[in-house]
C-alpha cells in the first residue's frame, strides 16, 4: 500500500508539473480578457499604443507560455506581459505568501552601469561593497535586463531600475534558470563564487530588498528628532481593522497641531510610501491646514475623469464602498456608490467610457489661505512614492508654505483606482485600474523632482534631520 501511495504521489506531481504551460496560458488569457473588458486603456482614444501591446505583447507571451516548466517560468511570462504596458497600476501578486530563495546577498545598481553588493547575511559579509561582474558567462547588465527590468521595471521611469535591481538575487524556489556561479571584484581582486541558495520568507525578503535599495521606511507616527518634527507616513494602505492606526495618527495631529504650527522644522515624511487610499492624505491636510484649504486644493485641480464601464467594475465599486464605510471614510463610500449608479446607467446605454460629470473639470480658485505654520515645512519623498502618495504630493506641492525635498518620486500612468480578481490557476491575483485622468497634475509616467535633492548616502532619520536644519541657511 505504501508503494502505491508513493506511485500516486509521483503521478500527481508529474501531472501537476506538466500543467504549467496550460496554467500559464489560462492565466495569460484571463489577464488579456480582464483588461479588454474592464480597463480604460483598450477604449482610450488618447492611447493607441495600449491596444498594440495588448495584442502584440500577448502573442509574444503566448509563445513563451507554451515553454513554461516551473512556477518561476509561469510568473516570468505573466509579469513580462503585464510590465510591457508601462502602467504601474497593472499589478500581479501571489495569491498566498510563498518562500523565495537567495544566496545570502543582494545587489543594487546605481543607474550608471555599476552594480554592487549592498546587503548581506553575516556569512556573506565579505562581499559587502564588491562589484558584480557577471554570472555564468553573462554580464551584469544583461542579467538585470533579462531577470529584473523586463519583468518588473517601468522603462519610462529610469530611476525605478535602482529600486528594482535588488530583486536580481531573489528568486522562486523552483527557478531552474537562477545563476550558479558569479564573479565579483572584491577589494580589487576578481573572485568567482559558487552560489549557495537558501530559503527566505516573504516578510524578510521584502525587508532585505528595502535595505539593499537604500530605502529607509519609517514607522507610522509623529516624532521629534534633533529638533525636527517628522510626520511619518510610510503608506496610505489602511483598510478594515488597520484603519484605526491612521485614524489615531490623525487624532494625534489634532492634539499636537499647536506645537507643530509653532515648530521651527516640520517634515511630512513619505519615504517608502507606494500608495493606498488618498483620502487619508486629504484628511491630514484638512487637520493641519483646515477644511477650507483642503476644499480649495480639491477644486483647484482639473479632475476630468473617464471611468471604464463594465459589470465587473460596477460591482467592485459597490464592494469598495462597503469597505470605505467600514474604515470610517464616509465621503469615499458615498462617492463610489454614486459612480457605480452612474456606471449602471451608462452600461445600459452601451457606453464604454463614462465622463464623471460630478467632478471638477477645470482649474478653480487659486489657493489664498494663509499658512498656519510659523517655521519651515517640507515634503520628503524617495523613489517609492506612487499612486496615493503622488496624490498627496499633488496637494502638498501646491501649498505655498511647503518645500519638496529628497529624491525624485516614482510615477503613475494616467490610469488609477484599482480593483482585483483571482486568476484561474489560483496562483496569482491580478489588479487593474477603473478610470483615466485626462489632465492630472502629474502627467503620464512623469515623476516629481524635489526642489532640493538629497545629497546622497543613506537617507537615515538622523542624517535627514541634520540636513533639514541646513536648508534654512
Indicate where each model-derived feature is located.
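N-terminal signal peptide c-region/cleavage motif recognized by signal peptidases
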Residues: 12-14
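Low-complexity, serine/threonine/proline-enriched polar segments
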Residues: 299-353
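Low-complexity, Gly/Ser/Thr/Pro-rich intrinsically disordered linker/tail segments
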Residues: 439-473
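Flexible, low-complexity junctional segments that flank or bridge functional domains
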Residues: 17-317, 322, 376-378, 391, ...
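Bacterial N-terminal signal peptides that target proteins for export
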Residues: 1-4
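Flexible, glycine-rich surface segments
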Residues: 338, 342-408, 414-417
Amino acid at each position: 500500500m505504501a508503494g502505491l501511495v508513493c506511485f500516486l504521489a509521483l503521478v500527481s506531481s508529474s501531472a501537476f508539473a506538466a500543467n504549467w504551460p496550460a496554467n500559464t496560458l489560462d492565466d495569460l488569457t484571463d489577464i488579456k480578457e480582464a483588461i479588454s473588458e474592464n480597463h480604460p486603456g483598450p477604449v482610450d482614444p488618447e492611447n493607441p499604443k495600449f491596444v498594440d501591446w495588448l495584442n502584440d505583447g500577448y502573442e509574444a507571451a503566448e509563445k513563451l507560455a507554451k515553454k513554461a516548466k516551473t512556477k518561476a517560468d509561469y510568473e516570468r511570462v505573466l509579469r513580462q506581459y503585464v510590465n510591457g504596458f508601462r502602467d504601474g497600476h497593472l499589478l500581479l501578486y501571489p495569491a498566498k505568501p510563498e518562500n523565495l530563495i537567495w544566496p545570502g546577498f543582494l545587489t543594487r545598481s546605481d543607474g550608471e552601469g555599476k552594480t554592487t553588493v549592498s546587503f548581506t547575511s553575516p556569512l556573506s559579509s565579505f562581499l559587502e561593497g564588491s562589484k558584480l561582474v557577471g554570472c555564468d558567462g553573462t554580464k551584469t547588465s544583461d542579467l538585470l535586463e533579462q531577470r529584473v527590468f523586463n519583468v518588473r521595471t517601468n522603462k519610462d521611469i529610469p530611476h525605478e531600475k535602482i529600486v528594482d535591481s535588488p530583486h536580481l538575487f531573489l528568486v522562486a524556489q523552483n527557478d531552474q534558470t537562477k545563476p550558479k556561479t558569479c564573479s565579483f571584484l572584491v577589494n580589487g581582486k576578481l573572485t568567482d563564487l559558487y552560489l549557495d541558495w537558501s530559503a527566505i520568507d516573504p516578510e524578510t525578503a521584502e525587508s532585505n530588498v528595502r535595505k539593499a535599495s537604500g530605502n529607509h521606511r519609517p514607522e507610522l507616527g509623529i516624532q521629534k528628532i534633533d529638533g525636527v518634527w517628522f510626520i511619518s507616513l510610510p503608506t496610505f494602505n489602511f483598510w478594515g481593522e488597520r484603519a484605526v492606526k491612521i485614524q489615531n495618527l490623525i487624532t494625534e495631529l489634532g492634539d499636537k497641531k499647536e506645537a507643530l504650527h509653532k515648530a521651527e522644522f516640520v517634515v511630512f515624511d513619505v519615504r517608502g510610501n507606494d500608495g493606498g487610499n488618498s483620502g487619508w492624505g486629504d484628511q491630514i491636510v484638512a487637520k493641519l491646514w483646515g477644511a477650507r484649504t483642503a476644499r480649495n486644493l480639491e477644486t483647484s485641480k482639473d479632475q476630468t475623469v473617464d471611468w471604464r464601464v463594465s459589470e465587473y467594475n460596477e460591482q467592485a465599486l459597490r464592494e469598495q464602498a462597503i469597505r470605505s464605510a467600514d474604515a470610517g471614510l464616509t465621503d469615499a463610500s458615498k462617492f463610489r456608490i454614486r459612480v457605480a449608479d452612474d456606471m449602471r446607467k451608462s452600461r445600459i446605454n452601451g457606453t464604454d467610457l463614462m465622463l464623471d460629470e460630478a467632478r471638477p473639470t477645470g482649474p478653480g480658485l487659486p489657493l489664498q489661505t494663509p499658512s498656519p505654520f510659523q517655521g519651515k515645512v517640507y515634503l520628503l519623498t524617495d523613489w517609492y512614492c506612487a499612486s496615493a502618495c503622488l496624490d498627496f504630493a499633488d496637494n502638498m506641492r501646491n501649498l505655498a508654505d511647503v518645500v519638496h525635498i529628497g529624491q525624485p518620486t516614482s510615477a503613475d500612468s494616467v490610469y488609477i483606482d484599482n480593483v482585483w480578481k483571482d486568476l484561474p490557476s489560483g496562483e496569482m491575483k491580478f489588479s487593474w485600474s477603473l478610470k483615466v485622468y485626462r489632465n492630472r497634475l502629474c502627467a503620464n509616467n512623469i515623476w516629481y523632482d524635489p526642489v532640493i535633492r538629497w545629497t546622497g548616502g543613506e537617507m537615515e532619520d538622523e542624517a535627514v534631520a541634520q540636513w533639514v536644519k541646513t536648508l534654512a541657511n
